[in-house]
Amino acid sequence: MTLRLLEDWCRGMDMNPRKALLIAGISQSCSVAEIEEALQAGLAPLGEYRLLGRMFRRDENRKVALVGLTAETSHALVPKEIPGKGGIWRVIFKPPDSDNTFLSRLNEFLAGEGMTVGELTRALAHENGSLDLEQGMIPEMWAPMLAQALEALQPALQCLKYKKLRVFSGREPPEPGEEEFGRWMFHTTQMIKAWQVPDVEKRRRLLESLRGPALDVIRVLKINNPLITVDECLQALEEVFGVTDNPRELQVKYLTTYQKDEEKLSAYVLRLEPLLQKLVQRGAIERDAVNQARLDQVIAGAVHKTIRRELNLPEDGPAPGFLQLLVLIKDYEAAEEEEALLQEVLEGHFT
């Protein structure tokens, strides 16, 4: 329904739906400034964009916003969701048609060589005859041009068809259809080396193979660094799921990881999360206790010991999940920054 809304909204504004995003799940009380702030943080990898309009959806009791892009973008760069006021906002995107992309590149190359697709087809078929590579039936005059065309179109061909990676979730034991970490990592590393595509496409294919806890780890890292590379993703997975630390040493490291003096609380939580997921993977923390374990360590390791009160978290209430906690902290940090800015303005006014 939301993709159809994106297409209809763009059609009404006479714009290309592939140059737009629909942001859904926005709180009814969220202001334009708060929407802009969330977009600035969540859509940074996309470059220039513009908030075009907002709409209230009665069936969800939430707002949606239309965002315009300056150009079509890669599916790998568009986040599926971004943190915003009141919770997580969904990002709806109409990806480019890979077949059209390939044909566009082919036509662009041929136009530069003064050829048409029909002429290229006849050259490959050797004037409508059968193509016999063993007998060297490609005309000598076309050979260099065809080689150049294949080289130029290799990235597009790689994107159109590729062998998907095996599935890894980090669960123990692996579920049917999933690989254990060592075998998965070896296979994935070899495949990624062989792909001749941009890093963003490699990262998209990597994320496509992840499930469960493994996918959660990379999502956490992407929140902190939207431009994280494939190598950095693999390194993080190695640190969490590779056999390195014993559970006791890991638990000590987790419990002695504290917020640094100049470090934001949200950055501390993001730094802490891979260690927590590793403890869960080793069986040192039960999965149903992970939210409470996270909250306990954040409160214990935070510079300001009143953080539970600042976040309005009751002593006897259930611990929030990771994304919910991060949203609470982001709102708290935004309020603190706004208060500090106001104080600075007031001090400048009265001095």
UniProtKB/Swiss-Prot annotation:
Residues 120-127 are annotated as: BH3-like. One of its GO terms (molecular function) is ubiquitin protein ligase binding. It is found in: Cytoplasm, Cytosol; Mitochondrion outer membrane; Extracellular vesicle membrane. Keywords: Apoptosis, Autophagy, Cytoplasm, Membrane, Mitochondrion, Mitochondrion outer membrane, Ubl conjugation. Its main location: cytoplasm. One of its GO terms (biological process) is autophagy. It comes from the Eukaryota. The keyword Membrane applies. InterPro entries: PNMA, PNMA_C, PNMA_N. Ubiquitinated and degraded during mitotic exit by APC/C-Cdh1, this modification is inhibited by TRIM39. GO terms for cellular component: cytosol; mitochondrial outer membrane. A motif (LIR) lies at residues 49-52. Residues 202-205 are annotated as: RASSF1-binding. The keyword Cytoplasm applies. Belongs to the PNMA family. Retrotransposon-derived protein that forms virion-like capsids. Acts as an effector of BAX during apoptosis: enriched at outer mitochondria membrane and associates with BAX upon induction of apoptosis, facilitating BAX-dependent mitochondrial outer membrane permeabilization and apoptosis. Required for death receptor-dependent apoptosis. When associated with RASSF1, promotes BAX conformational change and translocation to mitochondrial membranes in response to TNF and TNFSF10 stimulation. Also promotes autophagy: promotes phagophore closure via association with ATG8 proteins. PANTHER family: MODULATOR OF APOPTOSIS 1 (PTHR23095:SF14), PARANEOPLASTIC ANTIGEN (PTHR23095). The protein is evolutionarily related to retrotransposon Gag proteins: it contains the capsid (CA)subdomain of gag. Homodimer. Under normal circumstances, held in an inactive conformation by an intramolecular interaction. Interacts with BAX. Binding to RASSF1 isoform A (RASSF1A) relieves this inhibitory interaction and allows further binding to BAX. Also binds to BCL2 and BCLX. Recruited to the TNFRSF1A and TNFRSF10A complexes in response to their respective cognate ligand, after internalization. Interacts with TRIM39. Interacts with RASSF6. Interacts with ATG8 proteins MAP1LC3A, MAP1LC3B and MAP1LC3C. Does not interact with ATG8 proteins GABARAPL1, GABARAPL2 and GABARAP. This is Modulator of apoptosis 1. It comes from Macaca fascicularis. The lineage of its organism: Eukaryota, Metazoa, Chordata, Craniata, Vertebrata. The gene is MOAP1.
